[in-house]
Amino acid sequence: MESTPVSRRGMVAVVALFASLIVLGSASSALATEHHPKGDFAVFNQCPLSNPATNVCIFAQTESGEFIVGKKTVPIKNTITLQGGVHVIFNAEREIVGTEFIGAENGVTLSKTPQNVPGGLAGLVNCFEISNFFERIACEVIFENGLTGVTATTELAAPASSILLSGQNLIEAEGTALFLPVKVKLGNPLLGESCYIGSNSSPISLSLTTGTTSPPAPNEPITGKIGKVEFKDEAAVTVIRENSLVDNSFAAPAAEGCGGIFAFLIDPLVNAKLGAPSAAGHNTAILSGTVEQGNATYVKASE
């Protein structure tokens, strides 16, 4: 294995890193083609090789970091996986002029990985803030019965093709490396199945960079990290470790759909605790981990 500083060699579209955060995904397809690559290519078993446009296979994992919305910080402690492929677009001179992301073969482009929310339900819902006596009693009966754990799960708020990648950013740390429209599901039996920050029509739009951000106040600039690159199989596989993508310029909408039929009571309480909706300059995403990219031709040949 060869280790070297990041360069253009073997770096086609490797900027398809993480999501973070942000776990996300769409329904899997029962008709998806199964692939069984071998050796160093085994991690690319969900590369969309059935799509002839796929030039590069992507397997990326967010292993640490944090997601801050308004007043609430959620550390990333459970690994989030992003997988799929990239169609690399060349001009007549065979120069790379763009990329298009292609979702995973089984449809699960971004894993739905729950992260524990510090403080649990007590950190999101405070029934004492309800002034109406009967509504406050109803809140206490429903939300103060011991089911206190809350998780936050990041999901894609648009098709995988909405993911935008830029190899230029990973190489030179300028501009956006990875664009992701996401929504965050708050999980707890008492919050119901439809408690989300963001939606398909009003997503949290992350523009992640390995460079330095330029957020509005009160946030201050933060800087990502390109990471360390290794080559396997004569550069047919590129591995980037200790990579960090950051964004602290995005806005976050209010949470909606929390508490089922009691959403009219619970949504305002959750949003008060979160500080949502939260304007740009009050939120932060830091996604750190490892990305692997492989030449699709070699991946297919290894099966």
What are the language-model segments listed below?
Residues 1-32:
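Secretory targeting and sorting signals
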